[in-house]
Amino acid sequence: MTDTQSPFSFAAALLQCGSPGQTFSMESLLKPELGEYSPSGENGIDGEESTICSVCCDEASGRHYGVVACFGCKGFFRRTVRAGKNYVCRYSKKCRIDKAGRNVCRSCRFQKCLEVGMEPDAIRPDRDKTGRQKNPRRNTEGSIKKVSVGSILGDLPCLNKFKDDSDDAATSPSSRADSAPMDLRPSFIDESVLTTLTEIENIVIQLQDNFETNQQSLPPMGEAITKPSLIAARTLLNFNGAKGVADANCVSSNLRRMIVFTFDYINTLRPIADLHPSEKLVIARSIISPFCILFCGYQSVAIEAPEHDSIYLPSGHKLPASQLLFTKDSDQKKYILLENKADNVRRNMTEMIIQQLRRLNVTKTEMVALKAIMALDHNVKGLSAESCELLVVARESVQNALFSHLIATFGTAEATSRFAHLLLLIASATRVAYSLSSFFQLSRDVNYEIDYVLEELLFLDRI
C-alpha cells in the first residue's frame, strides 16, 4: 500500500505547530540536519523511565512494544503491523517525525518506530489491550495515564469510535463522563474537534510557496488535486483591499488562488486527506464553488472594512458594488449581458453571504466548523461505501461539536436557532454558486473565453 497522504496532513494542524505569524512550507516539515532533540534513550534522569515518546517526543503514556511511547504512536505502529501495510516516502525519507508533524509521512514514522526499538513481534492479539483478549482486563482509576491534547488529535476524535482498532480517543479522558448530567459545557472531545479545525485553518491560510512553482494554464485536475501549485502559486492571502479595484483578469487569478486554498484544505482535513486522489477530486468538484464563496465572504467581513458592499479578494484587491468588471470593446451587447450577470453574482454574494455573516456575527470557531461540515459531505457521486461511511462519522462529530459549543455559549434555546441559521449559510453559498455557474454558461454562449481551471471546477454543469 502506498502512502498517498498529503504533506499538509491533518497532524500538521495540531497544537504547537508555530506562532500565528509563521509561514509554513514543505521544508518546515522535513528533518533538520542538526540541532533537533530526539530521545536517544528510554531512561530519564537517574535511571527513571522517560515521559517523552521515543518516536515523536510527545508526552508518553507508558511502555508499548518495547519502548516508551505515546498512545498515538503505539496505535499507529500496531495498525501498520497488523494490516501488513507497506508505506512509501515521497520526500527522500527526510520527513521530520515529531509531535507536530508525525502524520506527515507514514513511511518515515513507521521507520522511526523501528529505529527506536518497537518490536513487531510484541503485537499479540491475546496480549494487546485493544485487540482480542482471552481475559479482558478492566481499568482502574489509578491506572489511567495522562494524555496530552497533541497525542489525541491525530484524527477528528469522534472518528475513532468508528474504527475497531482505534486507540487515542478510546483511551483518552473525556469531560463528558465526568460532568454532571445538566452540565452544558462541551466535552473534551467536542473541544478537541473545534481546536483541531481552527489549527487546520491557521496552517492552510499561512501556507506559502517559497520556491518557484510550475503553474500551468491547463493543469490536469487529477494531478493538481495532489499538487495544487500547478493551478496557482501559494501567495500571501491578504484581504485588506489595499491594492484597489479588481478587473475580470484579477478576479480569475484570485479564484485560482482560492481553489488552491480549497485543495490544500481537502488535503489536510481527515478523513478526506486519506482518500484516493480520485475521490478527493470528486469531493473538490462538489464543494469548491460554495466553499470559496463562503471563505471569501467571511474574510470580507472579518477585516471590518468600512465598505460593507464590497467583496474583498485574497490578492489585496476588492470588488465594489458599483464598479464595472469588464472593459467594453466593439461588441457592446455581449459585455452588457456579461456585466449584468456578474453584477447578479456580486449582489447575491453581498446579500446572501456577507450581510448574513455580518448580521449573525459569525465567529471563527463557527466558520471553521461550517467549512468542515460542507467538505465532509458524503452525498457525492463517485465515493466508495467505505469512504461515505467515514465522512458520515466525521461530519456528525463536527456537527455535534459545533452544537455543543453553541449550547455552552448561548444556552439551549438560542443555540438551536443559531445552529439552524449557520447551516442555512451553506445553502446560501450553494445558491450563489449556481448564479456563478449561470455566469459561466452565459460566457460560453456569447463566446467569452473563460479560464480553463475555473470552467473545469466552478461550472456546476460539470459536476
From Swiss-Prot:
Chain intervals with Basic and acidic residues compositional bias: 121-131
Xref: Pfam families: Hormone_recep, zf-C4
Domain of life: Eukaryota
Domain NR LBD span(s) in chain numbering: 199-462
DNA-binding region(s) in UniProt: 50-125
ZnF segments: NR C4-type: 53-73, 89-113
Xref: Gene3D superfamilies: Erythroid Transcription Factor GATA-1, subunit A (3.30.50.10), Retinoid X Receptor (1.10.565.10)
Compartmental location: Nucleus
Cited CDD domains: NR_DBD_HNF4A (cd06960), NR_LBD (cd06157)
SUPFAM superfamilies, alphabetized: Glucocorticoid receptor-like (DNA-binding domain) (SSF57716), Nuclear receptor ligand-binding domain (SSF48508)
Transmembrane stretches, start-end: none
Chain spans, region Disordered: 121-143
GO-annotated molecular function: DNA-binding transcription factor activity; RNA polymerase II cis-regulatory region sequence-specific DNA binding; zinc ion binding
One GO term describing the cellular component: RNA polymerase II transcription regulator complex
InterPro entries named among the record's database cross-references: HNF4-like_DBD, NHR-like_dom_sf, Nucl_hrmn_rcpt_lig-bd, Orphan_Nuclear_Rcpt, Znf_hrmn_rcpt, Znf_NHR/GATA
GO BP: hormone-mediated signaling pathway; regulation of transcription by RNA polymerase II; tissue development
Keywords for the protein's UniProt record, in alphabetical order: DNA-binding, Metal-binding, Nucleus, Receptor, Transcription, Transcription regulation, Zinc, Zinc-finger
Family: Belongs to the nuclear hormone receptor family.
PANTHER family in the record: NUCLEAR HORMONE RECEPTOR E75 (PTHR47519:SF5), NUCLEAR HORMONE RECEPTOR FAMILY MEMBER NHR-31-RELATED (PTHR47519)
Function of the protein: Orphan nuclear receptor.
Designated name of the protein: Nuclear hormone receptor family member nhr-3
Species this protein is from: Caenorhabditis elegans
Source taxonomy: Eukaryota, Metazoa, Ecdysozoa, Nematoda, Chromadorea
